[in-house]
Amino acid sequence: MSFAALKTHAMSRPGATVDIKWGADWVASVGGKMFFVAGPEPGPCKACSFKVDEHRFLELTGLHGFSPAPYLARAKWVQLSDARALALAELRALVGRSHELVLQRLSKKLQRELMP
């Protein structure tokens, strides 16, 4: 499994847009709010970060390959530095859940516009 597979999955989420922020970080957003960060660009990705449910934050940060995401940990974001930490299906589910968590915080009107 590679970080590229997670980036592809993030891009496939409904309403997802991609941008390069802070000079080199690849950011997937929904409704202007980021839900997945990988970097740097260009070059091979060495880590990615995404939002998780509050009840999963401590569990995940206790696993090898996961840590609290710099600058975003208080918002329950984790950083994944080892793409082999979990099975691809579970990592894809976590990225999908990150998208859902951010989407839920958007206005109902914007949610309707973004969802097919």
Name what the model sees in each region.
Residues 1-116:
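Charge-dense, helix-prone N-terminal extensions
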